[in-house]
Amino acid sequence: GTGSTGIQAAPVIAEKAKYLTVFQRTPNFSVPARNNTLTKDFKEYVKNNYHELKSLVKETPNGHAFRISEKLTFDIPQKEREKKYEEYWEKGGLQFRGVFKDIITDKKANDSASIFLKKKISQVVKNKEYAKILTNFDHPYGCKRPPIDTNYFETYNRENVHLVDIKKDPIIEIDKTGIKTERNYFKLDTIVFATGYDAMTGTLINLNITGENSLNLKDYWNEGPKTYLGLQIAGFPN
């Protein structure tokens, strides 16, 4: 898997394992997280501006404590636009989504950002075949949860890391000693399943909530979640 979990796990596993094989179905956009130790000045800034930051979280569409630019992508010349992309790439984290106001709402604006990200990833990954597989995106930037990473794409420059494109070479079978694809067999000691999880509805379903007429929430949501305004469920305790 190469969603947010796999993207975090792969670089760390690659440092310890003699050999790592990553099986990718869907390539994901990712921006460097730029994690670092919180400085004394930053801590003081947050404490001194806590209420303002809290208000900002409530005001922004994505619920994060950073402002989304009021500028539209094509309101500025290309050279200046590229400079802005570079600036936000260096900042890292989720802020890249806020570099321009229309990235998530305008297809051409999104294409501009996507092309930049594809270029940056291709610059990082030295193996051209891997770079092509990792940037063969089937969705606009931000339309799936965009992960952030620490040295994820750099990981594919290591000699002990191998990438398998399971769209071209699908997994057929997993047995006791490894994974069989349509064209190859990969003998493995350990398999890490980073294939996703039921993040939103899973917790509620596992509570075994029962409503009117002994109807179980799991059965009620059998064909997908149904709510009132995303807050209440008809016929169940709310």
Model-derived regions, located:
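N-terminal FAD-binding dinucleotide-binding subdomain shared by FAD-dependent oxidases/monooxygenases
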Residues: 2, 17-238
